[in-house]
A protein has these predicted regions:
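Membrane-associated alpha-helical segments
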Residues: 154, 158, 162-206
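Hydrophobic alpha-helical signal-anchor/transmembrane segments
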Residues: 1-91, 190-198, 203-206
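Juxtamembrane/interface alpha-helical elements of multi-pass membrane proteins
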Residues: 60-151, 156-167, 174-176
Length: 206
């Protein structure tokens, strides 16, 4: 119903035009459609249970709360997608570093790999990697660019990785091992979360 580019624009609240992944501003039209949709569903549910137009109409008032609930769902979904995309980025970047490439060259290679995995140019991780490369091209450090990304992502896995990444860059630590370890950890968390969701869904239908 709403294009990904439009959704990305509505999600941006910062003056610099970058995405804050904890923010999603629902457009007026989108909000209206969500309220109407929720009102119809609530009316139908109310009528099935109460067989009363009056009570069903009262239940429709709860539809006003739906845009906020939907906004939180969109934010959560976007952050889950970003986590998975970040895992793929780490895998590609660690592969590039393992053959002797610099971090900067590795990011360029990782971006090319990600463009194959995610053909939509508006995919979050593609936009973030492109922004990081532009920043590096303007003489910003890799550490500062990743740190900015982590601040906007509001994701523990990314924040933890960036903290270790910055330390490794300063002390000469094993970046390849850090990236592989972080990628594996994220993958394990995703698998556990999916198993829990599958179990919960299964119990609902028992």
């Amino acid at each position: 119903m709403f294009g990904k580019k439009k959704e990305m624009e509505e999600m941006t609240e910062r003056e610099d035009g970058l995405i804050d992944y904890n923010v999603y501003v629902m457009g007026t039209g989108e909000k209206a459609i969500n309220i109407v949709f929720a009102a119809i569903v609530l009316f139908a549910v109310g009528y099935v249970f109460y067989h009363s137009i009056f009570l069903s109409a009262l239940l429709m008032l709860l539809a006003l709360k739906w845009p906020k609930i939907r906004t939180n769902q969109i934010i959560e979904k976007r952050k889950n997608q970003l986590t998975l995309q970040f895992k793929d980025m780490l895998y590609s970047l660690s592969s590039a570093l393992s053959v002797g490439k610099s971090v900067e060259s590795g990011i360029e290679d990782a971006l090319k790999d990600l463009q194959v995995i995610y053909p939509d140019p508006q995919t979050e991780i593609l936009l973030e990697m492109e922004y990081i490369l532009r920043g590096i091209g303007m003489n910003n450090t890799t550490e500062s660019m990743f740190s900015q990304f982590a601040e906007r992502a509001h994701l523990e896995d990314i924040e933890n990785f960036v903290d270790i990444f910055v330390t490794c860059k300063r002390t000469g630590g094993d970046l390849i091992e850090v990236m592989r370890s972080t990628s594996n950890t994220i993958g394990e968390k995703i698998e556990v979360k999916q198993e829990i969701e599958t179990t919960i869904s299964g119990k609902k239908y028992e």
